[in-house]
Regions:
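An amphipathic alpha-helical core segment
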Residues: 214-246
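Alpha-helical packing segments of well-folded alpha/beta enzyme cores
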Residues: 39-43, 50, 65, 69, ...
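Active-site beta->alpha N-cap acidic-glycine motif
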Residues: 1-79
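Active-site-adjacent pocket scaffolds in enzyme catalytic domains
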Residues: 110, 115-118, 122-225
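Metal-dependent polysaccharide deacetylase catalytic core of the NodB/CE4 family, i.e.
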Residues: 50-131, 143, 148-153, 174-175, ...
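Generic enzyme active-site microenvironment
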Residues: 8-11, 81, 121, 225
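Short acidic/His/Gly/Ser-rich catalytic and metal-binding motifs that mark active-site loops
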Residues: 14-19, 187-189, 233-238
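Non-membrane alpha-helical structural segments and their capping/turn regions in soluble enzymes
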Residues: 33, 37, 95-103, 204
Length: 246
């Protein structure tokens, strides 16, 4: 069975991590050393060497400050998608706040690439049962794809019973195709296996085994995500507040 998997990237810097949001003020973002250019180019090089096309969910705030990087991602044949503008949890926003943030980021990205932005991913997969209203707003603003619903149980995100396969969601404003990050059903629970911190925690052979099982047994694509800062061996330290955050 020939299954095409999905490699996705959340383009943000190390100090944007949601675990630090109460300790790193947005007004101070520009005071931190930026690592996003070098790390994203390192990732672009890896993808090019292996002939992989990816979807890059770019933070609007970053796109304003590194427009050449967004153009380079686009010029190298990758899809440029939206990660919002301010890196705020969706369920901490009012619907019209979310819409304004969505439009602001989309307009910046479309101006830089000359192409319509069709896909969106929320910070920390924060479209949960509390914020399903965001799906209708996405559809009403012309988005066709979303990757914000994580079918797991987590203190910050997740809808444990959500469909783990790529599927269509019908909203009053039109349809969206949802691309959940991959999970494996183990001991009656959905276990996240599709990248991010989970990729760093698990041995590589486990991830490869799960990828193969999702492709072969379930016949569906493996949806993987990574942040550029996760490839940085010299990442500056931000005062982590707990061992789990670190």
């Amino acid at each position: 069975m020939n299954v095409r998997n999905a490699f996705t990237v959340d383009v943000e810097d190390y100090y944007h991590v949601s675990a630090f949001e109460k300790h790193v003020d947005r007004a101070e973002w520009e005071t931190y050393e930026s690592r996003v250019e070098a790390n994203t180019r390192r990732l672009l090089g890896l993808l090019e060497r292996h002939g992989v096309e990816a979807t890059f969910f770019v933070l609007g705030w970053m796109a304003e400050r590194f427009p050449h990087l967004v153009r380079e991602i686009h010029a190298r044949g990758h899809e440029v998608a939206s990660h919002g503008y301010w890196h705020r949890l969706v369920y901490d926003q009012q619907p019209e706040e979310f819409r304004r943030d969505l439009i602001r980021a989309r307009d910046i990205l479309e101006d830089l690439t000359g192409r319509a932005v069709a896909a969106y991913r929320a910070l920390s997969f924060s479209i949960t049962r509390r914020s399903l209203w965001a799906l209708e707003i996405l559809a009403s603003e012309g988005f066709r794809f979303d990757s914000s619903i994580f079918p797991v149980r987590h203190d910050r995100y997740g809808i444990p019973g959500a469909n783990p396969a790529i599927h269509r969601i019908d909203t009053p404003a039109g349809p969206l195709w949802e691309f959940p990050i991959s999970v494996m059903r183990i001991a009656g629970l959905n276990v996240p296996v599709g990248g991010g911190g989970y990729f760093r925690l698990y041995p590589l052979r486990w991830t490869l085994r799960w990828l193969g099982k999702i492709n072969r047994k379930h016949g569906r694509p493996f949806v993987f995500y990574v942040h550029p800062w996760e490839l940085d061996p010299e990442q500056p330290r931000v005062g982590a507040r707990s061992p789990l955050s670190r």
